């Protein structure tokens, strides 16, 4: 298994600066990670720096609360793609899901899918805020909306990915939709446990630590 190709090497902190982006990009090149996941303001910079490599540029939409309008999320998506994004990680409208407004949640996801063209869309369900029934419903709505991946977490709420959530999400979406475990992979052991549970992508700031077989303290 090439665990490096599962990793979205992530830097989403509000106070991240260009020197940290440069380090992230160089590490992603060195380890041939699947992508770098960066905030929208850094997409054009990352895309230019990674041109000619296999490393994709991933960014976030409606992040981290998911509470912007669908039109805003669609605009963010188009803007990110124009700037060079290959993959879009959007946050669902969690409040609408919890109050049972399922069609609105699905339509919100679909707005981003339609805005993305042929680019990859991952939807973040923020599993730490949901009951198991809500997690299942969110994944079902995501499949209906035509997304490419479901993703556990933003890394900015009360918890990150768990093995049990990854298993439940994989069981719900079946074999043809990706599952991204985000937040919580601090070591190679963690990463392998998520893959064993059904993850096909891992969002983490500890990608280098994982590749070295070490354990990270803190981070995403």
UniProtKB/Swiss-Prot annotation:
Q: Where are the transmembrane segments?
A: none
Lineage: superkingdom: Bacteria
InterPro entries, sorted: Aldolase_TIM, DeoC, DeoC/FbaB/LacD_aldolase, DeoC_typeI
The EC number of this protein is 4.1.2.4
Primary localization class, coarse: cytoplasm
The metabolic or biological pathway listed in the UniProt record of this protein is: Carbohydrate degradation; 2-deoxy-D-ribose 1-phosphate degradation; D-glyceraldehyde 3-phosphate and acetaldehyde from 2-deoxy-alpha-D-ribose 1-phosphate: step 2/2
- Pfam families to which the protein is assigned, alphabetical: DeoC
Q: Which subcellular locations apply to this protein? A: Cytoplasm
Q: Which family does it belong to?
A: Belongs to the DeoC/FbaB aldolase family. DeoC type 1 subfamily.
Name this polypeptide is given: Deoxyribose-phosphate aldolase
**Which species does this protein come from?**
Streptococcus equi subsp. zooepidemicus (strain MGCS10565)
The gene coding this protein: deoC
């Amino acid at each position: 298994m090439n665990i490096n190709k599962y990793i979205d090497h992530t830097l989403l902190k509000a106070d991240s600066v260009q020197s940290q982006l440069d380090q992230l990009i160089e590490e992603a090149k060195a380890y041939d990670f699947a992508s770098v996941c960066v905030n929208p303001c850094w997409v054009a910079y990352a895309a230019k720096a990674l041109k000619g490599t296999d490393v994709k540029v991933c960014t976030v939409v409606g992040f981290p609360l998911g509470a912007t309008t669908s039109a805003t999320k669609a605009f963010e998506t188009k803007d990110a793609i124009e700037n060079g994004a290959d993959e879009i990680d959007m946050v669902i409208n969690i409040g609408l899901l919890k109050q049972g407004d399922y069609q609105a949640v699905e339509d919100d996801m679909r707005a981003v899918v339609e805005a993305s063209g042929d680019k990859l869309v991952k939807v973040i369900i923020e599993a730490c805020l949901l009951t198991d029934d809500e997690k299942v419903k969110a994944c079902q709505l995501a499949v209906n909306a035509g997304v490419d991946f479901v993703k556990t977490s933003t890394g900015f709420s009360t918890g990150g990915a768990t093995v049990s959530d990854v298993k439940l999400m994989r069981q719900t979406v079946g074999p043809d939709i990706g599952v991204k475990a985000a937040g919580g992979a601090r070591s190679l052991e963690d990463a392998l446990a998520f893959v064993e549970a059904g993850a096909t992508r891992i969002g983490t700031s500890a990608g280098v630590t994982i590749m070295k077989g070490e354990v990270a303290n803190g981070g995403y």
